[in-house]
Amino acid sequence: MRNVLLPLAMALLVASNPAMAAVGEPAVSDPDIKPRSPTVPVITDDTGLFETFGGREWLVKIMDDVMPRWIKNPRTRPFFENSDHERIKRQLVEQFCVIMKGPCEYSGRSMAEVHRGMNVNEGAFFALTEELQITLNARGVPCAAQNRLIAAIAPMHRDIIDR
């Protein structure tokens, strides 16, 4: 578990420090990660990562598995208790699919707009990411694939954290 969370922590640290990460740019120096927009960066022009994750069907299963974890975790529960879980899962599937260059379109709002006023703190953001990685591990997603996804979504940290 430690060797999975260390790259995550590093990516999030870089993403959360403006001196270390350019605004709108990926948190790591991976030439395959290309930002498409502040809402949905695209990892690569190759669909290999999308296929490694098992395509849209597996993204749906991952979201079905992780949502109860977010609701149960005391650090993330307040942000999910009174929300439309099905809509959130659907939009996260779309977002992750686009990030991984799958055949999807993201229909949601920007991360800054969605999270404005929610008072999401770093502890909640990190807990959400930890629960996602636990779920990805349980689903057998290879560590390298997890790290590429986490590195691509880490810059969204700036748009989600309020305090």
Model-predicted segments: where are they?
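Bacterial N-terminal signal peptides
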Residues: 7-17
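Core of compact, soluble alpha-helical bundle domains
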Residues: 21-163
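Positively charged n-region of N-terminal signal peptides that target proteins for export
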Residues: 1-4
